[in-house]
Amino acid sequence: MTLDLVLVCPGCRTRTPERLDVKTLERTGDLLVCECGRQYPIIDGVPIVFADPAEYLRGEIATIVERDLSPAVAALLVAAGPDDAPYPRLLEHLSIYLDAQWGDRAQPRADGAGFALEAVIARLAALPHVGAAVELGCSVGRVLAELAVHAEHVVGVDLQFGALRRARRLLDGERVAFARRISGRHYAPAEIEAGDRVVPAARRQIVCGDALDPPLIPAIYDRVVALNVLDSIARPRQLLAVLDGLCAPGGELILTSPFAWQSSVMHEHERFGGADPAADLAAILTTGDGLGARYQIEDSAELPWTLRRDARSVLSYRTHYVRARRT
């Protein structure tokens, strides 16, 4: 398998009871092209591949055409607000997740809570080497970098283009400057380098796409990862089915979630597990309910997960970790 072949056209993908038909995308300049005629843009090294790319582009054009501004200029642009405008929202999102994922490699280090992945990375570091790993919800790319330590090829999918631009640059070995939120719309400059977590482009692919409809060839990934995505997506049961569909025979799923269900994200009937969603998740995996296979739970734990919003505000979760083998 080469990474040139892992992206498929979601627009013409067809499924019947007997088979799934997919067409791979070929690169032509700054486009990925399908023989069906559909085309998908590659911007700053990141392909944007959705079944309806026009709808995504209309809603996210501000983050797609965003320039690399110095932290001082970026902070000045958002100072007047409002908070819910696209660029202030992007700047806040990047501040939170760059520190959460790369805070141990940031200069200066964040005051208070910063790096949030220590417990997860320790578990990933103990896993055996595999051929291919995929992460849905890869954000700014740190877990993708850790997966690459124990995988020949890694693929990351996320909906947030601004985060993926930073992931691509960090994994390429570039120094990324960002604005770290101090209070309200006030920011201070910081920067990150991946160091020994650089991942050569020949070994990885980053794509802007829908985790519920990823443009990926099914059933080829030995390690399938989705960290803190389950309760951040409209259809968590569908996400489990997608993860199962990507998993190769004998492969493993790695999931974390604090199960912080929100009505603004999903309908009430999409929630599962009542007072003990971790037990319900284990039951879904071990029985194969709604999936194409059953899974054996090989590891589970309750891990800390903190997100620094600014110098005075931290979101703290206890996230459930589970690693399960396809049987």
Residue ranges and their predicted role:
Residues 212-224:
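A short acidic, Gly/Pro-enriched loop at the edge of an enzyme's catalytic core
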Residues 183-184, 266-300:
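Conserved Class I S-adenosyl-L-methionine
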Residues 171-212:
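S-adenosyl-L-methionine
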Residues 96-131:
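Conserved alpha-helix/loop element of class I SAM-dependent methyltransferases that forms part
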Residues 160:
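Conserved SAM/SAH-binding beta-strand->alpha-helix loop
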Residues 250-258:
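Conserved beta-strand signature within the Rossmann-like core of class I S-adenosyl-L-methionine
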Residues 237-249:
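A short glycine-rich, Lys/Arg-flanked "PGG" loop and its adjoining helix->strand segment in the class I
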Residues 140-150:
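Conserved SAM-binding loop of SAM-dependent methyltransferases across substrates and taxa
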